[in-house]
């Protein structure tokens, strides 16, 4: 099994995540609400970028590629932990697709965030197994967790 730290892309993503974690406490206290919204939207955009090809594979629209799945699942696993501090109460009046329930039903929103993180972690773990059927089943669980959160907490376009 290869060392994940040997992969420069994984190193970069880990370093970026660590940097965000280290400065998030003090930086968020000073960060403008508009910037926090942009930060969470950027993370969600990246989640979509890495989820899209996997969703296509799950639906049979794109040929299954285990290498891409494993790489994208790893990115999604990391990204699934990043947007939540950008939903600070200070952002509730900033124009975005977030519904008021994000800020009024915080326990349910936290459960939805945890569900995505757990399902993304499981996807990354199963992606390393090489079991295409298991991977596709877990992709379904990730998609369901994304959709569940969007259904309850995101305005429909």
Placement of each model-derived feature along the sequence:
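N-terminal signal peptide c-region/cleavage motif recognized by signal peptidases
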Residues: 24-26
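Bacterial N-terminal signal peptides that target proteins for export
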Residues: 3-15
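Active-site-proximal loop/hinge segments that shape catalytic or ion-binding/gating pockets
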Residues: 17, 21
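Sequence context surrounding c-type heme c attachment/ligation sites in exported
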Residues: 34-157
């Amino acid at each position: 099994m290869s060392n994940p730290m040997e992969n420069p892309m994984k190193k970069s993503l880990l370093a970026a995540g660590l940097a965000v974690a280290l400065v998030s406490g003090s930086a968020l206290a000073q960060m403008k609400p508009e910037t926090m919204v942009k930060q969470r939207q950027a993370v969600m955009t990246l989640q979509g970028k890495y989820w899209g090809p996997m969703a296509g594979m799950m639906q049979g629209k794109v040929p299954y590629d285990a290498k891409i799945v494993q790489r994208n699942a790893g990115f999604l696993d990391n990204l699934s932990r990043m947007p939540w501090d950008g939903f600070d109460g200070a952002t509730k009046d900033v124009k975005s697709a977030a519904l008021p329930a994000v800020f009024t039903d915080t326990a349910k929103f936290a459960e939805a965030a945890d569900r995505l993180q757990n399902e993304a972690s499981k996807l990354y773990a199963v992606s390393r197994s090489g079991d295409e059927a298991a991977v596709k089943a877990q992709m379904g669980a990730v998609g369901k967790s994304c959709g569940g959160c969007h259904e309850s907490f995101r305005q429909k376009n």
